[in-house]
Amino acid sequence: YIGSGRTDKYWEVAFYGGSFSAIPRAWQEAVLAPAYEALLEGKIDGIRCSTRPDALALEDVDFLLEHGVTTVEIGVQSMDNQILQMANRGHNRQDVIDAVGRLKEKGMTIGLQIMPGLAGETWTSLVETAVAIKDLRPDFVRIYPVLVIENTDLADAYRAGDYQALTLDQAVAYGAFLKDYWEAADIEVIRTGLQATRELDQGRGLVAGPYHPSFGELVENKRWRDRIQSLMD
């Protein structure tokens, strides 16, 4: 399909769904090779991947850059060390800061993924995460409120009463706040809420949490309502 001709669109090969830079180097090279060839031939305009901050040592960043990766998205989730530990993320705040610094030094485009609603989060910790992300100056951010999925430790904690999921109204309010805050700092928020799927729409595998197929629209509606209300007050 790529070889059928170019248009004025921006074409990109993306490797999502896991921590790309953490898989064996030979596997990375095997899938990057055809993408890099297409990039060199002008058939695509860029390559991006998603990964975790503690899998972005200098040698990892150099490898990605040498194989044509132009954008890296990092699963940050929170900048609160206690929350990250409770979620068993395996990384900490400093790992994020270091990873972003290395990517910036190499001139790569940086995206950060944030998950409001993790266990232990408070309004104060959410605001502190928002400020920390602003200070890192990424090129863009994605906001994914936590959903409780079947057959996970979080589902067990939810059923045991040890975790309380965000309501839809809470998640929309958080999303509106974060988007307002980051966009005021000229940081683009390119997505709020998970991409709708047939499984999620039918509730399959979803135990709890603020899923809505039009979550992004709900956030935008909230932002506009708040602006109008502020003008009326």
Identify the role of each PLM range.
Residues 1-4, 9:
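Alpha/beta catalytic barrel-like cores
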Residues 17-169:
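Conserved non-cysteine loop/helix-boundary elements of the Radical SAM core domain that shape
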Residues 5, 117, 151, 209-210:
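Glycine-centered flexibility motif
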Residues 1, 35, 228-232:
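Generic hydrophobic alpha-helical segments
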